[in-house]
């Protein structure tokens, strides 16, 4: 029996929780050590603090408590003896052991899995084992059994060793070598019992069995090592894709242990199968040239381009192969203009209008033209951008890519073979966020396919996948990895040209069924390096059943903890920190948590596509919101129907009932099949599609697809020699401290890990201080070591990340891990940093301080993913671009007021939405237009604080609420408080908290804006925006005849209050310096009682002064407005007519339209203050319609 105080592989935080519940000094438990294999940790509670002592085994498998130098060590043959000894007083511990904390009773009330053995009782979750579970190893806790329980009589049966000896004697062993037979007998007689002890204590190690198998396989391993090179040479001989000059990498034979043996045998069988396939393909198809290009036919898009307010239809033809963008006025007409790929500088997506795109092109006279087009829908625009990116990539002069596209697919096949045609899955066609037809011919760089309940063999499934991809892309993809656990499988395929860019391939699996061995649930994973970027992929099948949510959560934690992928040097970090990009997908089995009697109501909502109502009850979204699973992961918005449980061979009916022996079982329609991802901070990743197919119906699940753009780095070679002065880079952390949620009484130190460091760096111990709410604050001050990167070129160093682990000095166990990006907008400057700390998937605290980065001289080249940017215009409506939510704000830095003033911008200064808070980037403008700051655009310091991300979960995660009832969805005006806020993280454009701006209920009309250059479209009611007369004096511009002002984007909590920004803008309006503040007058004639419409940004407390909005485009030259005195402002009364400011030059048609309807608008009774004068030519302020609602 395992003692009640032995808790096996529970986490440190769980141990602290159990001890804290008892509240008694001397309470104790033993758990497995997280830092040393086969070691244990003795945890003792004393005065509400947890003290941890390490229990180490020696070479003779005797146990001792690690002690300080000079203290004599006591050894014990069993853990029980050690615990009994330290129950005595004054034995060296902080207090003697008194109250053992028993194991928690596991919830066994749920029905067993449909496909598992019901008669087996499920013990606590343990790590994967290397041998089948025996009866003795199942006894995980002391439970009183009745006489009817057959296990109660196990003590009267022969021992396991005797039983196996009898079995060995009955076997024919005449063919066994004598030394092998003797080794087996020795193992059964003495060593089996010792291995059994390891199993009982929850260890996954069986050292004596490994020694036995190593001895038995010694000669076989040598033969395999000698045979493999010959087979590999034969395989390369028939490989059509391999370059002739490529030489195989030398392989160093590893140790002849069972793990290496299994790996080599698997490699041997795979090679034999591969050689046969390659010879067949070569004889059938003949040799083909390596890196055969895929031909993408020209694609034509019908768009609208507006001129003087009149839309004109045009044709944009993208010829990827020739590298041209052709512009035609009619589909069958001659070419009007064309631009080569070198002349196309940038694509700028409108954030508010999802079908609008700006193209920046360079003319022959080296001028920059800004061309605006409106596509039929957002999918067409996205397809156009992908084709242009493909063109840029195809004709790029860079030897290595800096962005790749990844396809992720997950499908529970329901133990049924697939249909003949599954290409819609790989084309991302069906429901949800799908790809446009124009992108069909663009192959992804990497395809990752995860299946569950897969009835096919690996060879059969691989042939189907490759054939389907070749049918739609004309590319023969290379197999990177394939790994199977029971019926859970993951396949990774890559383009042939990427074969030599992929290295360090690793596969692993974790069982999460009954006792971690029985059943069919678990996970398989693959990881590899793509040049300098680490990628990880996990396909999991979690426990089924709507009521088993907690067990699913535990499945996730076990996979997270025990899946061994990636760089083994990153031992303190689990898979969520080991990869630049980690993708987790599969049949996660989280359900819609509603009563069974609402089944028909659910189906009706699905038919009406009311997914938001159902997603508010989605278990996975709820658990993520409460930070119980998938902490800091991302998921694209779900806009497709639930993928489970359908009647087979149709997608029109959900089969939500199933008759079982125990009664009727309900499986309400749910989104069981999901794709989530987690990337390092400030790394480019955009989800381009997320949906499910509608035509693959052999299973009760529908396949789910997701596609991503992901930034990658190359294997960088420094241009500077190691001896040059400017190559000495340095990373310095200053005034750093960690806040931990722990009751442990120990000292802490930091470890810094990174691929840019030669090896990890360890710091000195920090100073502990008591924090608020029982937290512990560990301050490191100026004692942290200065890190020396191996390469200091900024092109390399700014793409790197530093992984931080805070560890206990006593046990060397990690208490939290975090990640810091080195992509800083300024070097040689101290900048604030922040990262949350997590451990085993739980939030354990945070780390913050300052960083100073020193690089060598050099420039960073523009990345391919910078070619497509998102213009930060006004906050968009309900359908914002989801690419802007591709980073968790918890991963960003809390940086306050560090945006330097910006007086102008260039083409490359448009912020990438995935590089939130990086520098003072702003929107582009033609280079031949001189840029000047207007008084409304004085530089303002913005905060880069990133708040914890809770809001993005749910049906409308990260998006702004719908447009208020009285607010028109479209306005031709843009608003930008200042130039400096161009560095504001785009996420602030997506969230408009309802509590912001409540004191700014007064809706302020505003004047026409003569300072703007042509915007995305023109409206005749507002006049043409094509000319730029000089601005009117400020005194005249403040007259109450201006049209309604659009509400500016409201930042999330944690961002600098917009009231601060607007105050500074007001100071600029009055011509005052920032140090001299003038109170703004309250113009009551513009006060509006509507609280839901037209609020000024973020709570403008002055509430009175109407301000001229500044276009999100860069301003044109303008004279400084006349500064009115306070008396002049106060003398302005709305009923008194005031001189009108000069209006922009308008076309005759526009003037006629305004003159003919001006008085009707002026006299309209819907105006909020129809007693006030308005000029006839002025357009009606939209405020008039909203104030009455």
UniProtKB/Swiss-Prot annotation:
Motif position, NPXY motif 1: 912-915
Composition skew (Polar residues), residue ranges: 931-943
UniProt KW keywords: Apoptosis, Cell membrane, Cytoplasm, Cytoskeleton, Hydrolase, Immunity, Lipid metabolism, Membrane, Phosphoprotein, Repeat, SH2 domain, SH3-binding
Enzyme Commission numbers on file: 3.1.3.86, 3.1.3.56, 3.1.3.36
Complexes and interactors: Interacts with tyrosine phosphorylated form of SHC1. Interacts with tyrosine phosphorylated form of DOK1. Interacts with tyrosine phosphorylated form of DOK3. Interacts with tyrosine phosphorylated form of SLAMF1/CD150. Interacts with PTPN11 in response to IL-3. Interacts with receptor EPOR. Interacts with receptors MS4A2/FCER1B and FCER1G. Interacts with receptors FCGR2B and FCGR3. Interacts with receptor FCGR2A, leading to regulate gene expression during the phagocytic process. Interacts with GRB2. Interacts with PLCG1. Interacts with tyrosine kinases SRC and TEC. Interacts with c-Met/MET.
Entry text on domains: The SH2 domain interacts with tyrosine phosphorylated forms of proteins such as SHC1 or PTPN11/SHP-2. It competes with that of GRB2 for binding to phosphorylated SHC1 to inhibit the Ras pathway. It is also required for tyrosine phosphorylation.
UniProt function note: Phosphatidylinositol (PtdIns) phosphatase that specifically hydrolyzes the 5-phosphate of phosphatidylinositol-3,4,5-trisphosphate (PtdIns(3,4,5)P3) to produce PtdIns(3,4)P2, thereby negatively regulating the PI3K (phosphoinositide 3-kinase) pathways. Able also to hydrolyzes the 5-phosphate of phosphatidylinositol-4,5-bisphosphate (PtdIns(4,5)P3) and inositol 1,3,4,5-tetrakisphosphate. Acts as a negative regulator of B-cell antigen receptor signaling.
Protein name in the entry: Phosphatidylinositol 3,4,5-trisphosphate 5-phosphatase 1
Source species of the chain: Homo sapiens (Human)
Organism phylogeny: Eukaryota, Metazoa, Chordata, Craniata, Vertebrata
């Amino acid at each position: 029996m395992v003692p009640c105080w032995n808790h096996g592989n529970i986490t440190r935080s769980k141990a602290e929780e159990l001890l804290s519940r008892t509240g008694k000094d001397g309470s104790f438990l033993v758990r497995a050590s997280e830092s040393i294999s086969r070691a244990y940790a003795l945890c003792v509670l004393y005065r509400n603090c947890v003290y941890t002592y390490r229990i180490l085994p020696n070479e003779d498998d005797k146990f001792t408590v690690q002690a300080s130098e000079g203290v004599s060590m006591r050894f014990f043959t069993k853990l029980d003896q050690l615990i009994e000894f330290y129950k005595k007083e004054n034995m060296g511990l902080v207090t003697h052991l008194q109250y053992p904390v028993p194991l928690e009773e596991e919830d066994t009330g749920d029905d067993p899995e449909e496909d598992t053995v019901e008669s087996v009782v499920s013990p606590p979750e343990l790590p994967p084992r290397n041998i089948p579970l025996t009866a003795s190893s199942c006894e995980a806790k002391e439970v009183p059994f009745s006489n009817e329980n057959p296990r109660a009589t196990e003590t009267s049966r022969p021992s396991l060793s005797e039983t196996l000896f009898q079995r060995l004697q009955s076997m024919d062993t005449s063919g066994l070598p004598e030394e092998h037979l003797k080794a087996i007998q020795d193992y059964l007689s003495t060593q089996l019992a010792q291995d059994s002890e390891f199993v009982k204590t929850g260890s996954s190690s069986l050292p004596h069995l490994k020694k036995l198998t190593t001895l038995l396989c010694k000669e076989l391993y040598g033969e395999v090592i000698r045979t493999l090179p010959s087979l590999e040479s034969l395989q390369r001989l028939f490989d059509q894709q391999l370059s002739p000059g490529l030489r195989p990498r030398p392989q160093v034979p590893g140790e002849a242990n069972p793990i290496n043996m299994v790996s080599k045998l698997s490699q041997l069988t795979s090679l034999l199968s591969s050689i046969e396939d390659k010879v067949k393909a070569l004889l059938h198809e003949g040799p083909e040239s390596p890196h055969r290009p895929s031909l993408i036919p020209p694609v034509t898009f019908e768009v609208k381009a507006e001129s003087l307010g009149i839309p004109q239809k045009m044709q944009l033809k993208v010829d990827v192969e020739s590298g041209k963008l052709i512009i035609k006025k009619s589909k069958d007409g001659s070419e009007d203009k064309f631009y080569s790929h070198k002349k196309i500088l940038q694509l700028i997506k409108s954030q508010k209008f999802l079908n609008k795109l700006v193209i920046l092109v360079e003319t022959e006279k080296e001028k920059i033209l800004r061309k605006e087009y409106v596509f039929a829908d957002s999918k067409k625009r996205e397809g156009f951008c992908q084709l242009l990116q493909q063109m840029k990539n195809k004709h790029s002069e860079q030897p290595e890519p800096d962005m790749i596209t990844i396809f992720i697919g997950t499908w529970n096949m329901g133990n049924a073979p697939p249909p003949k045609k599954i290409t819609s899955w790989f084309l991302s066609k069906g429901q949800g966020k799908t790809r446009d037809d124009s992108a069909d011919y663009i192959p992804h760089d990497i395809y990752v396919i995860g299946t569950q309940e897969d009835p096919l063999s690996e060879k059969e499934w691989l042939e189907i996948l490759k054939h389907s991809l070749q049918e739609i892309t004309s590319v023969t993809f290379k197999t990177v990895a394939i790994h199977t656990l029971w019926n859970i499988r993951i396949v990774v395929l890559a383009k042939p040209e990427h074969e030599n860019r992929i290295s360090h391939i690793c596969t692993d699996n974790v069982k999460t069924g009954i006792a971690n061995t029985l059943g069919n649930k678990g996970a398989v994973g693959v990881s590899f390096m793509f040049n300098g970027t680490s990628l990880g992929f996990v396909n999991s099948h979690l426990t089924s059943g709507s009521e088993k949510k907690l067990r699913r959560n535990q499945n996730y934690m076990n996979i997270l903890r025990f899946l061994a992928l990636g760089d083994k040097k990153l031992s303190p970090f689990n898979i969520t920190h080991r990869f630049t990009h980690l993708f987790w997908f599969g049949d996660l089995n989280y359900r819609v948590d509603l009563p069974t009697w609402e089944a028909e109501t659910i189906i009706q909502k699905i038919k009406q596509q009311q997914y938001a109502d159902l997603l508010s009850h989605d278990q996975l979204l709820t658990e993520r919101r409460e930070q119980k699973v998938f902490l800091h992961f991302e998921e694209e918005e779900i806009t497709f129907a639930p993928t489970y449980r359908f009647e087979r061979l149709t997608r029109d009916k959900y089969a939500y009932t199933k008759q079982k022996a125990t009664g009727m079982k309900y499986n309400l329609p749910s989104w069981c099949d999901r794709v989530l991802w987690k990337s390092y901070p400030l790394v480019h990743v955009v989800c381009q599609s997320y949906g499910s197919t509608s035509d693959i119906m052999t299973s009760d699940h529908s396949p789910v697809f997701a596609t991503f753009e992901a930034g990658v780095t190359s294997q960088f070679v420094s241009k500077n020699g190691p001896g040059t002065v400017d190559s000495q880079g340095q990373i310095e952390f200053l005034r750093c401290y960690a806040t931990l949620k722990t009751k442990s009484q120990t000292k802490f130190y930091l470890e810094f890990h990174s691929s840019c460091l030669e090896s990890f760096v360890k710091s000195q111990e920090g100073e502990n201080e008591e924090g608020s709410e029982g937290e512990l604050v560990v301050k490191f001050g100026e004692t942290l070591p200065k890190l020396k990167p191996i390469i200091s070129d900024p092109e390399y160093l700014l793409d790197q990340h530093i992984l931080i682990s805070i560890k206990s000095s006593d046990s060397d166990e990690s208490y939290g891990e975090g990640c810091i990006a080195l992509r800083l907008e300024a070097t040689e400057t101290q900048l604030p940093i922040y990262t949350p700390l997590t451990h085993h998937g739980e939030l354990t605290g945070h780390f913050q301080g300052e960083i100073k980065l020193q690089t060598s001289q050099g420039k960073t080249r523009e990345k391919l993913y910078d070619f497509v940017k998102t213009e930060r215009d006004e906050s968009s409506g309900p359908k914002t671009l989801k690419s802007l939510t591709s980073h968790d704000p918890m991963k960003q830095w809390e940086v306050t007021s560090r945006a330097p003033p910006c007086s102008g911008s260039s083409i490359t200064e448009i912020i990438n939405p995935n590089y939130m808070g990086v520098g003072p980037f702003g929107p582009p403008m033609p280079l031949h237009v001189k840029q000047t700051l207007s008084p409304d655009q004085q530089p303002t310091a913005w905060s880069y604080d990133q708040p914890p991300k809770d809001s993005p979960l749910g049906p409308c995660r990260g998006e702004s609420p719908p447009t208020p009832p009285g607010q028109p969805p479209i306005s031709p005006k843009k608003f930008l408080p200042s130039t400096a806020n161009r560095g504001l993280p785009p996420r602030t454009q997506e969230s408009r908290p309802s509590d912001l701006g409540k004191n700014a209920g007064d809706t302020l009309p505003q004047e026409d804006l003569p300072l703007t250059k042509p915007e995305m479209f023109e409206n005749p009611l507002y006049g043409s925006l094509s000319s730029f007369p000089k601005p009117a004096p400020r005194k005249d511009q403040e007259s109450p005849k201006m049209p309604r002002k659009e509400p500016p984007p409201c930042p999330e909590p944690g961002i600098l209050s917009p009231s601060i920004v607007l105050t500074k803008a007001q100071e600029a309006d009055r011509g005052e310096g920032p140090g001299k503040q003038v109170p703004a007058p309250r113009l009551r004639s513009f006060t509006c009682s509507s609280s839901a419409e037209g609020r000024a940004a973020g709570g403008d407390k002055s509430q009175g002064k109407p301000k001229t909005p500044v276009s999100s485009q860069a301003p044109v030259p303008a004279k400084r407005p006349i500064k009115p005195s306070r008396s002049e402002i106060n003398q302005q009364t709305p009923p008194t007519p005031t001189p009108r400011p000069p209006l922009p030059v308008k076309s005759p048609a526009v003037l006629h339209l305004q003159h003919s309807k001006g008085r009707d608008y002026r006299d309209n009774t819907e105006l909020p203050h129809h007693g006030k004068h308005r000029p006839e030519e002025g357009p009606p302020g939209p405020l008039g319609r909203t104030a009455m609602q």
